[in-house]
Amino acid sequence: MNSRHPSAPYRGRFAPSPTGPLHLGSLYTAVVGFCEARRRGGAWLVRIDDADRQRCRQTHADSILRTLETHGLWWDEAVLFQSLRDEIYRVALERLAAGSRVFPCTCPRRELAGSGPIYSGRCRARYPHPPAGEHALRLRVGDAVIGFDDRLQGRIEQDLGSAVGDFVVRRRDGLPAYHLATVIDDAEQRVTEVLRGVDLLDSTPRQILLQECLGLPRPDYCHIPVLTDRGGIKLSKQAGARPVDEDAPSENLWTVLALLGFVPEPPLIGAKPAEILDWAVAHWDIRRLPPGRRIDVGGLAV
């Protein structure tokens, strides 16, 4: 399905997973999305991607929302929590099953890890009926070749069969996979542009295929450079990124804006977060983002 009509009001979203407190890399993504939405006179939404019950914690979700508030990054509508939407995802899976788009997979994790990143198709025709035990569900990819135009990264095309193969849409434990939950929630929230880190660029063709299978609208996409340390490693919780200091929101915002090439005007030094964000929105142009796929934070304590 084509993208939304260009006259539709802009709707962006920030969708962190509550596996830990907000760090500088996540704050940077939130600031870029917030400024883009405000500059375009649109809405900025927040969604908590907590479908993974094993890794996500409500305390972290509360912390993330509090940090956004402290930094003046106020959202426009009620926060959506994936953990409350299991029934919606189940119905979508039933639709895929009714169209023979998914199949059960019982491949052990160890076997999958040893066979490389591309699924072999071992279970594709193995089960005429769903097995009784635990099993994942995979989407049949076939010969799908997906192309899209990313606002910053240009034309992207991917042959899903040779790049990833049939991919998981429901995990063995019954929880929805990231790609399924993401496309359903983006559609329900009427997101017109998915703005996120370039590390998720390769996920987009899978999500577009799911949108086509479920008859969902395709939003526009804008994948921004990620923040990395001096070793070129993306700032992340897994890599030990520190939580942002909630006692220094103005300083944190200026750090993010400086990494983006924005230099504060003297009267704004020491300003409150709301004033800083108003200034940033007034001067905002996403084309000013540094070129490439990463921004080195240098010697910052992150």
From Swiss-Prot:
This is Glutamyl-Q tRNA(Asp) synthetase. It comes from the Bacteria. One of its GO terms (biological process) is tRNA modification. The gene is gluQ. One of its GO terms (molecular function) is ATP binding. It is an enzyme of class 6 (ligase). ATP binds at residue 237. Disulfide bonds: none annotated. A motif ('HIGH' region) lies at residues 16-26. Its EC number is 6.1.1.-. Keywords: Aminoacyl-tRNA synthetase, ATP-binding, Ligase, Metal-binding, Nucleotide-binding, Zinc. The keyword Transmembrane does not apply. SUPFAM superfamilies: Nucleotidylyl transferase (SSF52374). L-glutamate binds at residues 13-17, 49, 178, 196. A motif ('KMSKS' region) lies at residues 234-238. Belongs to the class-I aminoacyl-tRNA synthetase family. GluQ subfamily. Zn(2+) binds at residues 105, 107, 119, 123. Catalyzes the tRNA-independent activation of glutamate in presence of ATP and the subsequent transfer of glutamate onto a tRNA(Asp). Glutamate is transferred on the 2-amino-5-(4,5-dihydroxy-2-cyclopenten-1-yl) moiety of the queuosine in the wobble position of the QUC anticodon. GO terms for cellular component: cytosol. Binds 1 zinc ion per subunit. Its cofactor is Zn(2+). The keyword Transmembrane helix does not apply. InterPro entries: Glu-Q_tRNA(Asp)_Synthase, Glu/Gln-tRNA-synth, Glu/Gln-tRNA-synth_Ib_cat-dom, GluQ/Sye, Rossmann-like_a/b/a_fold.
